[in-house]
Amino acid sequence: MGARQEPLTASLRRARAEGTGTGLMFIPLYDSNHLRSISLQYVTFALIAINVLVYLSTTVGGEQFTNAAMLGLGFIPSVVHDTAELAPQFVVIPAKLSYVSYAFLHADIFHLGGNMLFLWVFGDNVEDALGHVRYLAFYLACAVAGALVHGFIAPDSQEPLIGASGAIAGVVTAYLILFPRVKVWILAFARIPLRIPAYIVLAVWILSQFVLFLMGGEDQISWACHIGGILAGAVLVLVLRRRGVPLDDEEIVVPVAADAGQPAAVEVPPPAPAPRWGRR
C-alpha cells in the first residue's frame, strides 16, 4: 500500500486542465462543416449543459464549498494511488470515479468557457461521425486517459486535477483526423479573424501541447492531461467511427451558374447522406 500521508483537508492549489492551453493563441468561432448523419448533436448539448450546471452548483455556496467540491470530485493522484487520503468530510465518491468526475469541474468562468467553446465548435461533427452513444463513450474515455497520464507523470501529487480539456483534446484530435481540410473561422491572438483549414490550426494547437509538456509549461496547467486526451482521441476515433466514415473529409464546393451566366464556385450544403455514411 505504501506510507500514507496525513489526511488532505485543504488543497487550494489546483492543477487545471485548460481547454485553450496555449493562452489566447486562437479562439475557435465556427466551422464550415454540416452534419451528415444525425439531426442534432444531443450529446454535445448535454455535455455542455452538465458542465455549466456543475460549475454553477459548485460555486453558488462560496469559496469553502467550491474547495470542498474540488477535493471531493477532483482527480488527486496520491489519493487514487492510495498514498494519501482525504479527510472524511471531503469523501463524496469512490476515488476511482474521480477519473471521470474531475472533467466536469472548472476553476472559473474562463476555464469553463474556453473548454465549452472548443466542444461547441468541434464536438458536433465528431458526434456525427461516431454516433451518439459511441461519442459519449469516446468523450469519457479521453477524460480518463487524460487523468491516467497526469497520474502517471505526477503520481504523488496532492493537487486536484480539474477541467474538461483531457476530453476536449481528444475531440480536437478526432476532428483533425476526420476533417483536416474543413475551413475553421478563428480569432488568432484573440483579435485577428481568419478562416483556415483545420489541418493547420488544429495541428499547430496539438503540436503546442507536446512542446509545452516537454518544456514544463505553466505550473498550474496539466499538459500531461492534454497529451493523454490527444493520444486517446487519435486511437479511439479510428476504432469508434461509423462504418464508411472517411478520414480525410472536406467541404463540398461545386460549380454553379451565376446570375450573369458565368460559372462560380460556391459552398453548398452536402447532399443527403449516402448509404455508407448515413443515419443509424
Model-derived features with residue positions:
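A detector for small-residue-rich transmembrane helices and their helix-helix packing motifs
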Residues: G2-R280
